[in-house]
Amino acid sequence: MSMQDPIADMLTRIRNAQQVGKTSVTMPSSKLKKSIAGVLKEEGYVGEFSVNDAAKAELTVELKYFEGKPVIAELDRVSRPGLRSYVGKDELPSVRGGLGIAIVSTSKGVMTDRAARAAGVGGEILCTVF
């Protein structure tokens, strides 16, 4: 069976693993998923991540907790295969008054909404994290 939305699958795996208190989560790997994991690591939402280059590449993400609670309170998919969400540089959203981040796929790579604003580029809003 083919997967319709691999990014939504990644976000759901992270959300589910955090709800049951797992220390890490494993999923099929792709360049886009590695980029998203890199942004989440830079922003401090997850720990280290690694790619196992076996027959099928797998991405393992270490999850973070603070005082027993998951660091990620909310993880939502915005742009999806049935309804893509593209914004210009002036329309980039501010998540929860700047406390959260939006992960944006731009022509300069995958980055946060703040980095995209600083670079002066818009793109596809993949997801929001708070």
Curated annotation (Swiss-Prot):
Gene3D superfamilies: 3.30.1370.30, 3.30.1490.10. GO terms for biological process: translation. Part of the 30S ribosomal subunit. Contacts proteins S5 and S12. One of the primary rRNA binding proteins, it binds directly to 16S rRNA central domain where it helps coordinate assembly of the platform of the 30S subunit. The lineage of its organism: Bacteria, Pseudomonadati, Pseudomonadota, Gammaproteobacteria, Cellvibrionales. GO terms for molecular function: rRNA binding; structural constituent of ribosome. Belongs to the universal ribosomal protein uS8 family. Keywords: Ribonucleoprotein, Ribosomal protein, RNA-binding, rRNA-binding. This is Small ribosomal subunit protein uS8. GO terms for cellular component: ribonucleoprotein complex; ribosome.
